[in-house]
From Swiss-Prot:
It is found in: Cytoplasm. Its EC number is 2.1.1.186. It comes from Shewanella sp. (strain MR-4). This is Ribosomal RNA large subunit methyltransferase M. S-adenosyl-L-methionine binds at S187, C220, P221, G222, G223, D239, D259, D276. Gene3D superfamilies: 3.30.2300.20, 3.30.70.2810, Vaccinia Virus protein VP39. GO terms for cellular component: cytoplasm. Belongs to the class I-like SAM-binding methyltransferase superfamily. RNA methyltransferase RlmE family. RlmM subfamily. One of its GO terms (biological process) is rRNA processing. GO terms for molecular function: S-adenosylmethionine-dependent methyltransferase activity. The lineage of its organism: Bacteria, Pseudomonadati, Pseudomonadota, Gammaproteobacteria, Alteromonadales. Catalyzes the 2'-O-methylation at nucleotide C2498 in 23S rRNA. Pfam families: FtsJ (PF01728), RlmM_FDX (PF18125), RLMM_N (PF21239). Monomer.
Length: 361
């Protein structure tokens, strides 16, 4: 397939486009971008007929910052006849064999969501015909490729596939997280999603467990502290502002009324450092770098607030500088990931894991 279809947040098409152009070039897959403001998707059209197939196989979705989901796609199926929308889609997917799942989706915009009811109904007959054609297995199989059909408007769709080991497990790439009734703020969902994004499910018991010590810089009123407490951690919450009373009553939180940029932990056995402060992204990055160099944590999750312009360029500059500084200070083994999460707005969430191969004392 010639195209790569990428889902993103509405308003971030330019960032998603700039990123896929750079990453595709690194893999020597030439092409150009089709993107419109607030469409919530980007299409990278490759010069080679199998360029989309190459990218969906070789480009890790988790390494992309601004894409929520991606799939190799055929050309746009425009003007699908109301009398028979199924046949053109089945024909476009003729090269896909024995897929394990079908997802009929839309971009994440209010206009596209108006098609959601249609997509649910349409899934049933489409699934039946794809099974008959051999493109889809009779029973779902999580190890096989996923067929995606994304309606960008009435009678207009892209059809294609992704590999289950290089794909978001979520419909449209959006995790369905519930806001806890007792969470102090909606920002709580950001850290909940970040743990799911950056720590594989099979490693959560080891790396996000009860009894760990954690620090939350800029904690007030406690949205991120709540997620740490919920997982059984002992938390040093650092903020000049007040903390949620129910959180304090758990006995798992010690509140330090200090500036997060000046705080130094009394205990140095901290596993998790988290930080969601409204501050210039470069300044937050410098703070995390200082903590890493001092050896004050094992893993960190922090947010970088984005500027209005050159957002992709700014994020990449900060991440590249962080890697250089860590290496200059003798930290040669680390894992650095960054994602524009669903619950992020004008910010990205970064995960830094220091010396993953070494056990934590």
């Amino acid at each position: 397939m010639k195209n790569l279809f990428l889902f993103c947040r509405a308003g971030y098409e330019k960032e998603c486009a700039a990123e896929i152009q750079q990453r595709a070039a690194e893999l020597n897959v030439g092409g150009f971008v089709k993107a419109n403001n607030n469409d919530a998707y980007v299409v990278y059209q490759c010069f080679e007929e199998d360029g989309g197939d190459t990218l969906v196989k070789q480009l890790p979705l988790d390494s992309l910052i601004f894409a929520r989901q991606m799939f190799a796609a055929s050309e746009l199926l425009a003007d699908l006849p109301e009398s028979d929308r199924v046949s053109p889609i089945v024909a476009a997917l003729s090269d896909v064999s024995k897929a394990g799942e079908l997802r009929v989706e839309t971009p994440d915009t209010n206009e596209a969501k108006e098609l959601s009811a249609f997509c649910r109904k349409f899934t049933v007959p489409l699934r039946q015909h794809l099974k008959k054609s051999g493109s889809l297995l009779a029973q779902e199989n999580p190890k096989r490729p996923i067929i995606h059909v994304c309606f960008i408007g009435p009678g207009r769709a892209y059809a294609g596939y992704s590999f289950s080991n290089n794909s978001s497990p979520y419909f449209m790439g959006i995790p369905r997280l519930k806001m806890a009734a007792d969470a102090p703020s909606r920002s709580s969902l950001k850290l909940d999603e970040a743990f799911a994004q950056f720590v594989p499910k099979e490693e959560q018991e080891e790396r996000v467990r009860s009894g760990m010590n954690a620090v939350d810089l800029g904690a007030c009123p406690g949205g991120w502290t709540y997620q740490l407490v919920r997982r059984g951690m002992m938390v040093s919450a650092v903020d000049n502002g007040p903390m949620n009373e129910k959180l304090m009553e758990t006995g798992q939180v010690k509140h330090f009324r200090e500036d997060g940029f000046r705080f130094e932990p009394q205990r140095k056995n901290i596993y998790w450092l988290v930080c969601d402060m409204v501050e210039k992204p470069a300044r937050v990055a410098e703070l995390i770098e200082a903590w890493a160099i001092n050896g004050w944590f094992k893993e960190a999750i922090f947010n970088l607030k984005l500027p209005m312009k050159s957002r992709y360029k700014e994020v990449m500059a900060i991440l590249n500088t962080m890697q250089e500084i860590l290496k200059e200070n003798g930290i040669n083994e680390f894992q650095l990931q960054c994602k524009h999460l669903y619950h992020d707005r004008d910010e990205v969430t970064v995960h830094l894991w220091i010396r993953p191969s070494q056990a934590w004392n």
